[in-house]
Amino acid sequence: MAKRPYRVEVNYPKDKKPRYFLVKDVWFKGKKSKIKKSLGTNPPSEDDIKRYTDEFAFEIEFKVAEKKAEFSSNMFNFDYLNLEKVKEIERLRFLYKTFTELLTTNEIEAYEQSFEINYVQGTTSIEGNTFSLQEARDLLVDGIIPKDKPLREINEIQNFKKVKQYRDNYKGKVTIEFIKNLHYMIMDNIDYESAGIFRRTDDIVITGCDLQVAPSLLIEDDLTLIINEYYSSIENNKYTFEQAVLFHYKFEMIHPFADGNGRVGREIFNYMLNRENYPKLLFLGDDREMYIKSLKYGNKDEFEPMVKMFVNLILSQRYEILIKNLRKVVIPQKRGGQMRLTDFDNM
């Protein structure tokens, strides 16, 4: 758990009493600033400083995130979003980073477990899995298998235990091998013959899409191309979130596998976000319609509304809940020990 490095600063206005401020310095890639909160004209005692720190911690941390978002958003080149929308996403990124840095190791495990349950239930439900959120939790956490569920659906949920372990331990770039390994784990015990293997047929149709997928002979070449395009764009300061959305769409249109493309594509998308300290996107059943609609914009080469819908999804899912959860951890004396899985608001 990271400490909040606040300090007290005193200003001496001419012909006026000294004024005291609680200050946090802000540094981001060579740029610096500071956030100040006035404490009045009386010198604060150690007890005062502790009380002010707890009282103003959330306000200061929020303003720090805003300042870093201002710095970072001006460093990117973006094609489909305006500056204000980019600042919103960047503010979310830095609030999320602050939140996770304030958690203890046990609290991070509880938070990530809660997110993973929501994520797995959502990403599989998009593909037709009928597990409820509680049933997914019972299976993933307690190993309780619900009655009357098909073996395929059970394996679809359980396979994400291996996916999470692999994803969390992997620290490299997205590669062909990484993509195949994800698919193998996602489809293990479901489709033995094709798990981890690119499709060999072109007789593939994407439901609700009139466009043709990549020819099977070109799958690896096309994937290599979009992987290289993604990392080249990031190196040239293209906006990460935009580029991750575009990669996700291109991946789905290549459709490299006979089945499981959506689950693999969403894993890669969130991996790209998480590598750059953005919170992951939940693909909840309730958001299925908006998610599918956004990809359909891409089919018409209307990438601006597609990217904006992804932005709206992550902001609507994560921002308000992140604010609530940050308030819970930013003031230590009100936490009452380690936070539990149930202490966090829904992801």
Q: What residues fall within each predicted segment?
A:
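FIC/Doc superfamily catalytic core
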Residues: M1-D259, R263-M347
